[in-house]
Each structure stands twice: as structure tokens, then as C-alpha cells.
């Protein structure tokens, strides 16, 4: 695990520990059981054409603040109005300015499947995601031992959610497939130095194989990048910074899906 990723994971563990002290796992289990049924994240990404997972995050660790007017409910409605297929919500606090509360607000404001975007390493975070209304969550291969990845993926599905399993190279694709991942996200951003390689999805497409949803993550600057990824065989793109900086994110999404 890279130094940058290790630091983010350590902070996620610390944040989870603080929340665990305030709300027990037993209580979360009750809340998760009472949450509305999960919306089908994978099915939304399998719709004809290029699907868009529209992400909301107030900050970037490498670029700082992305907006000075962060309103998750309004963003969720704008994303849905623009034709997004799903919403991704950063809940990691340090570096991203996220909060679990943002997810609950976004989920209540739209009818799209909502993904919890965080550094998930603990079953508590999975229960918390479902209790907040999440329909899916992110699992990063580079942050987890293979057996741990498989266990967390199974726990995610037992809670009625799907996982976006993130990879960055051939070995990680193999680990994701062995764990049973159905939705695989190729992160074009190298978490060791935050550099971007937009050709990565094309190189890994054959490795992922058919029958699974493949998502291109990071570095989509506009419609040309989206079209290139679609031509490479990607089923969906996850777009964050472009939308956060857009004056009209709904119109920007229409340009990506059109």
C-alpha cells in the first residue's frame, strides 16, 4: 500500500473509531434493517449507452477546495435532472471534506442509486453505509488483503448493496475477479503520486472480461474523454471534479451521456 493511500486508510480507521464510540454496531444493525430497500446500482450502470456516476466532493487532496457552495441535496437533484445513472458521495473527512451525513441528504433528494465513496476497511463502515441509505460502496483492492476484500464484498452484499471494486493494474484485476466482483472500477489515478493515465481502462478491458460492469474513474475532462472511454469498452464513467467545477452540472452530464 502506498504512503498516500496508507495515510488515507489510517484516517478512515480513526474516523470510524470515533463514530463507533458514539453509535454501537448493534444500533447500526437496527438502523440498516430499517433503511429503505437498496436501489440496484449495477443494473443502473448496465443501461444502454455510457452510464455516468456523478460524484460530489467538496475538496480534493491534491487540488484543494473544488467549490465554495457545497449543497448535496441540490447537487443530487441536478445530477438526476442531467441524466446521471448513479451518484457517488465522498464521506471521507480529511482531504475531501466529506461526511456520512452528506450521503443521507443526497439519497433523500434523488431517486438514483447512491454510492458511498470512502476508504472502507471495516464491517462497521458497511453497516453505517446501509443505515445511511447507501445502495453501493467502494472497495479498493490496493487497500485490502485479498481475503479481506472477499469478506467485505460478501458483507456488502449480505446488507443488500453492491460494491464498486477499484483496481489500478492487472494483478489487482485478478484479485477483484477472484473475490467475485461484478462491478470493477479502473482508477486512472495512481494513488502513489496522483498522476493520471487515461489509457489504463483500454489496457485492462480484456483482463476484466465480459459479463461484468467496468467503470472508468478519474481524469474525465469532458465529452471527448468520455467518448474515448466508451470506445475502449467502458460501461460507465465516474466523474467528480468536472461536475464540481461546472456552473451547470446537469448540462455537463447531458453532454457526457449524449
From Swiss-Prot:
Transmembrane segments: none annotated. Its EC number is 4.1.1.48. CDD domains: IGPS. Keywords: Amino-acid biosynthesis, Antibiotic biosynthesis, Aromatic amino acid biosynthesis, Decarboxylase, Lyase, Tryptophan biosynthesis. InterPro entries: Aldolase_TIM (IPR013785), Indole-3-glycerol_P_synth (IPR045186), Indole-3-glycerol_P_synth_dom (IPR013798), Indole-3-GlycerolPSynthase_CS (IPR001468), RibuloseP-bd_barrel (IPR011060). One of its GO terms (biological process) is antibiotic biosynthetic process. It comes from the Bacteria. GO terms for molecular function: indole-3-glycerol-phosphate synthase activity; phosphoribosylanthranilate isomerase activity. The keyword Lyase applies. Pathway: Amino-acid biosynthesis; L-tryptophan biosynthesis; L-tryptophan from chorismate: step 4/5. Pfam families: IGPS. It catalyses: 1-(2-carboxyphenylamino)-1-deoxy-D-ribulose 5-phosphate + H(+) = (1S,2R)-1-C-(indol-3-yl)glycerol 3-phosphate + CO2 + H2O. Belongs to the TrpC family. HAMAP family: IGPS_B. The function of the second trp operon in S.coelicolor is to produce tryptophan for the biosynthesis of calcium-dependent antibiotic (CDA). This is Indole-3-glycerol phosphate synthase 2.
